[in-house]
Amino acid sequence: MKIAFLSNKLTLRGTEISLYNFADYNEKYLGNTSVIITRDYYKLGNARDIHIDAYNKFLKRFPVFYYVEQPDIEEIVAREGIEVLFIEKAGSWEGLIARNCFNIIHCVFSARQPHGQVYSAIHEFINEDSQTNVPIIPNMAIVEESSEDLREELNIPKDAIVFGTYSGKECFDIDYIRKVVEDIGSNPAFPNIYFIFLYIEQFGPPSDRIKFLPGTTDGIYKRKFINTCNAMLYGRDGGETFGLSCAEFSLCDKPVIGRAEEHSRAHLMILGDDMIKHTNYDELYEIVTQWPKHNKDVSNNGYKKYTPAYVMDIFNQYLPK
């Protein structure tokens, strides 16, 4: 079966990581053929979050076809003999569909406007929030294998306590969490506490113990980044409808430190008591500065069930027979 996977642009963020994983394991696990449909990087100008490295990663692995308008998608479907179109989208009806094949819509934020032959969501939270009952095709959680870290490269002592995160560039935006990072990272009383950020916009005054790194598609580098950390310091206002970065840290048995309440609560639902929670500056400050007291074993956390086999078996149930 030939399946096309569509996103309206390719970025370093979780939606396109998810799309890549589905396309990859559609071939590796289900034995189908995968192609990618998206818009041309060079025609998108300064569209938010697009990244040439993401395009190059997809181009290296899959045939990639570009559309400008909706009829172009149907032309690609007809020309390439595509039987199923899997579309990652927010969830609303915006006309993006192919009327000449079977469509699986994969909703990332809401599920209130059903369309396509299968209208699904990435986590049960979306059903709860949208007051719907659509099928759930979850994202899968995958990390590369590596035992190495970045401590020597980043001049971080082996015995230092390191908190880190990666996400969208603007997605470390809870004020009191940023203030904790700034205050501890600049306080000489805590010379052994470091903070590292991958693909996060720089904030606060410069400090040798607060390090900002560019985004990457290199899975081994991301695994080394995770291995460098004692824990993930989550800081996105609004929360997650799945939380792929939380999943990747959790697969590596790294505790996730996060705010106790968010609008989008999928990461809280999945991790439950395995998440180390706070509600204000003082609570987080105490967690970070007294880390050995708060560290916990999270080796049986809820993200570990989202293996490629588990997810692709669900995905396969919704393919046309």
Question: How does the language model describe each region?
Answer:
Residues 109-110, 117-146:
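Donor nucleotide-sugar binding/catalytic pocket of nucleotide-sugar-dependent glycosyltransferases
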Residues 139-208, 212, 219:
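Conserved catalytic-core segment of nucleotide-activated headgroup transferases in glycan assembly
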Residues 67-73, 200-201, 210-226, 239:
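Conserved active-site histidine-acidic residue motif and adjacent donor-binding/catalytic loop
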Residues 255-259:
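Short hydrophobic beta-strand element within catalytic cores of glycosyltransferases
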Residues 223, 246-251, 265-266:
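Short alpha-helical segment that forms part of, or immediately flanks, the ligand-binding pocket
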Residues 7-13, 20-72, 201:
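N-terminal strand-loop element at the rim of the active site
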Residues 82, 227-241, 254:
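Acidic donor-binding loop of glycosyltransferase active sites
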Residues 279-285, 289-321:
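A charged, aromatic-enriched C-terminal amphipathic alpha-helix characteristic of glycosyltransferases
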